[in-house]
A protein has these predicted regions:
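Active-site acidic catalytic loop and adjacent metal/ATP-binding pocket
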Residues: 41-57, 62-63, 91, 184-233
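All-alpha amphipathic helical-bundle segments outside canonical DNA-binding/catalytic cores
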Residues: 144-149, 265-278
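ATP/Mg2+ or Mg2+-diphosphate-binding catalytic cores
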Residues: 7, 18, 247-248, 265-267, ...
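A cross-family kinase active-site recognition segment
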Residues: 114-175, 195-197, 225-226, 300-304
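Juxta-kinase regulatory segment immediately upstream of eukaryotic protein kinase catalytic domains
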Residues: 6-40
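A glycine-centered beta->alpha junction motif in the catalytic cores
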Residues: 102-116, 132-136, 159-167, 277-299
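ATP-binding pocket architecture of kinase catalytic cores
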Residues: 43-44, 48-148
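Active-site activation/catalytic loop segments of kinase-like enzymes and analogous catalytic loops
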Residues: 216, 229-265, 277-296
Length: 322
C-alpha cells in the first residue's frame, strides 16, 4: 500500500528507536486507512514495539510501532502479505520510515486453543513453501534491514557472543568457549548442503500463529532473520515441550518434522537435525542483538529469560541433536 511521505524528522527518529508513539500523531495516520468507532488503546508496550488496539465497525484492527531493532518488520510483513496473502496477516497500511504497521484482525492465537500439534501439522508445510519462495528475495530483504544470520556468518557471531558480558556462570561461559571450534565445524558442515537460506521467523510459537476458522496465519515477523530455514522449528519444538508438555521422544516431533520437510524434498532428516543444533546457538546470537538495543533498566528482566536461551544452547555442546 502506498505510504505517506516521510515528513517527521527528529521525533520520528526518537520514536522509531524506542518503539513508543505519540498517540495523537498515530491516530491521524490510522484514520487515513480505517475509521475507529471507539477509543484506541495500548494492548502492550515493550522497548522494541508498541501495539494499539483499534476498534472498527464489525471488529478490530491492530497498529504496531516497531523500535529500531525491529524496524524492518513493517516492510517485511507487507512484502510477505503481498506474495502470501493467505498465510500472513492482512496488511492494511505500513510506513517504512516510521516503522509503523496496521493489520487486520487475524483471529485467535492458537495458544488459547492449547497449542495443539495438529494445528502445527496443518501449518508447517505452508510455512515451508513460503520460505522456499522467499529464497529468491534474500538480497532484497537484506538490503532493507532483515538481519543477516546466514550460516557462514555464525562462527564470527559466536565469537562476538563470547566477548560479551553474559548472564551465565563462569564455568558455563568456559563450556561455550571450548565449543567454539566444534561450532565452526558444524556450521561448515551445514553450509555445505544445498538448502537455500531464506526468511526464518525465529519466534514461531503458539502466540504468533492465529486461527480464523480453518485459516492459519503467522504474525510478528520482527525477530526474523535471513538464515537456515530449518532452524525455524527450534522455537516451535521448544514450546511444544514446555507448554504442550510433549516429551522429547514423542512421535509428534517426527510427524511435524516430516510435514515441514516434505516441500523441501527427500532425505533431509540429518540436515534438519544438524540445523536444529546449530539453530539453537543462532537463536541465542539473535537474542544478543535484541539485548543490545534495550535501555539498561530493562536488561535485568531480559537477562532472566536470555540466560535460559543460553543454557539451552550450552546443553547442545555435549548433547547429540534430536
Amino acid at each position: 500500500m502506498p505510504e505517506p511521505g516521510n515528513r517527521f524528522g527528529r521525533k520520528e527518529r526518537r520514536e522509531r528507536h524506542s518503539g513508543r508513539v505519540d498517540l495523537a500523531d498515530t491516530e491521524d495516520w490510522i484514520r487515513a486507512y480505517v475509521e475507529p468507532v471507539g477509543p484506541i488503546r495500548a494492548e502492550h508496550e515493550r522497548p522494541w514495539a508498541t501495539v494499539l488496539r483499534v476498534p472498527i465497525a464489525g471488529g478490530v484492527t491492530w497498529f504496531k510501532a516497531c523500535g529500531r531493532v525491529q524496524g524492518f518488520e513493517p516492510r517485511l510483513t507487507a512484502q510477505l502479505f503481498a506474495r502470501h496473502p493467505d498465510f500472513v496477516a492482512e496488511v492494511l497500511a505500513h510506513h517504512e520510515q516510521r516503522a509503523w504497521l496496521l493489520l487486520a484482525d487475524a483471529g485467535t492465537p492458537i495458544g488459547i486453543l492449547g497449542n495443539p500439534p495438529e494445528t502445527w501439522l496443518a501449518l508447517l508445510p505452508g510455512y515451508a513453501e513460503l520460505q522456499r519462495e522467499e529464497a529468491a528475495q534474500v538480497g532484497d530483504h537484506l538490503a532493507h534491514g532483515v538481519p543477516d544470520l546466514r550460516v557462514a556468518t555464525l562462527p564470527s557471531r559466536y565469537d562476538e557472543l563470547l566477548q560479551r558480558e553474559l548472564p551465565l556462570e563462569p564455568e558455563e561461559i568456559d563450556r561455550l568457549r571450548a565449543f567454539a571450534p566444534r561450532f565452526a565445524e558444524l556450521c561448515d558442515e551445514l553450509d555445505a548442503y544445498d538448502v537455500p537460506e531464506t526468511v526464518q521467523h525465529d519466534d514461531l510459537h503458539m502466540s504468533n500463529v492465529y486461527a480464523q476458522g480453518e485459516q492459519l496465519r503467522v504474525l510478528d515477523w520482527g525477530d526474523s532473520s535471513i538464515s537456515h530455514p530449518f532452524a525455524s522449528l527450534v522455537v516451535t519444538f521448544r514450546f511444544l515441550e514446555e507448554v504442550t508438555e510433549l516429551q522429547p521422544d514423542d512421535p509428534w516431533f517426527e510427524r511435524l518434522r516430516d510435514a515441514y520437510l516434505e516441500p523441501w524434498g527427500r532425505g533431509l532428516e540429518g540436515v534438519f537435525a544438524l540445523a536444529m543444533r546449530v539453530g539453537i546457538f543462532a537463536h541465542a546470537i539473535a537474542w544478543l542483538r535484541q539485548r543490545d538495543h534495550l535501555p539498561p533498566k530493562d536488561r535485568a528482566e531480559f537477562d532472566s529469560v536470555f540466560s535460559i536461551v543460553l543454557r539451552r544452547a550450552i546443553a547442545q555442546t555435549t548433547s547429540p541433536p534430536r
